[in-house]
Amino acid sequence: MQKNNYKPAKKKHLLLTALTSLILISCAVFTLCVYNRSYNAKALEDIRKADSSTGAPVSPPAISDAGGTDNENGTVNPEGSGNKSSASGELHGVWISFFDYNEKGYTRTSFTREAETMLDKCKADNFSDVFVHVRMFADAMYNSKYFPWSRYSSGKIGKSPGFDPLSIMVTEAHKRGLKIHAWINPYRITKDTTSNSALAKSSYAYKWRNSKSPSLRRNVLNYDGRLYFNPSKTQVQKLIVNGVKEIVKNYDVDGIHFDDYFYPYLGTTYRKNFDAKEYNTYVKKCRNNGTTPASIVTWRRRNVSRLIKNVYSAVKSADKKCVFGISPAGNISNLYLNNNYYCDVKEWMGNPGYIDYICPQIYWSFEHPSCPYKKTLNTWTDIKRHKSVKLYAGLAAYRAGISSKEAKAIGDKGWAKSNTVLKRQIKYAQNTGETSGFIFFDYSDLKRSSARKEINNATKLFK
């Protein structure tokens, strides 16, 4: 047979040929690895340069199984913890903010019509949850014992609209099979004024600010042209917790939600401004007791964490099924600056008793120079997370469909290059196996014609 006609010399030749091919392949693989190391070092250096002004976290590009830099739809599995996504179990949410309300207020009929329109749209776009603003500026879009009626309900702060907007929203959301979360800003009192005229005279903010007691006056702080509740004050913490508790007890909400407004940016004089007076009192007490005081940064973080823990406890004591979560700023390095936020998200994520979920606002495209989407999301998935805490991604629907000029103005050209950014962001997050849902900011962009193609491409994944 032909197979028997091969001579030993020819066999040796074939063996040498095979060995040579193997060596060449090995060299090619080695060269590819060296190239990738070189590429990643260069990319890391570029990121460092881009991040030098933002304080953004630095991490190398993700590497795919194929050996090159991971593409936007590639499968990655960064170190993290459980809570894996599943198409059927994901949360698909949208924020309905005070920007979506009418500042002139509503009648029962006009608000009901508005609520029906909003919720019909959310349902049509395959969302499962709505996050509805109920306290924007120490006010209430519901009948509250602790906070005055919002001007977004009646047109004037402290004036009843004659109906209960939150009650209508809860009823209409549940009619459509949507879950509803009451969204609260805990510390913010005013948007751009320090005038007493912006406060309802019946409000705690007004009474404290105009109190004869110096201690009570310190419950409201005037900073950078705005008014804030003092995060360090016990009366403030109790007020915020009571405001949460009444919502969960009186309304069939599915969740309580805080966003990224905690301590304001305090600048280079952060050691001396805002609640520094209360910190100095704390330091004196520590020294009198023979204990070492925490730094002002740690002290402020503890103030916020104490509130978060107390809110969580209040929510669960009122309704164990009701969830509590937070949507902090997406750049985690900024959260740990010495002069801003004071949000110890690693503490909240890594331990039970603080939150049920975290939803960082990752509002950048894949091409952002300092906080590209993949790198930023991976930073969050890498954080140790308790098994009870879910990770969602907050996505920028408001950047969908923007022009090249607009994208250039915000320093994020990736948004103008395609209408599949949100879709690819969702797929990438799902492929990490670490996220459990997404929330879009915000409702108004579901109606914007220039955003529709991008929104449609993304929300088809929610079916």
Where do the language-model regions lie?
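Active-site-adjacent "subsite" loops/lids of carbohydrate-active enzymes
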Residues: 86-110, 182, 187-246, 250, ...
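The substrate-binding groove and active-site-proximal loops of carbohydrate-active enzymes
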Residues: 99-109, 147-162, 223-238, 292-304, ...
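Short, acidic/polar
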Residues: 105-123, 236-247, 336-353, 373, ...
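Aromatic- and glycine-enriched glycan-recognition loops and surfaces
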Residues: 107-125, 152-176, 238, 242, ...
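Catalytic domains of carbohydrate-active enzymes, especially glycoside hydrolases
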Residues: 113-140, 250-254, 351-357, 435
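Aromatic-lined carbohydrate-binding/catalytic grooves of carbohydrate-active enzymes
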Residues: 125-161
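Polysaccharide-binding and catalytic clefts of secreted carbohydrate-active enzymes
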Residues: 209-331, 336-346, 351, 363-364
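Substrate-binding cleft of secreted/luminal carbohydrate-active enzymes
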Residues: 350-370, 380-463
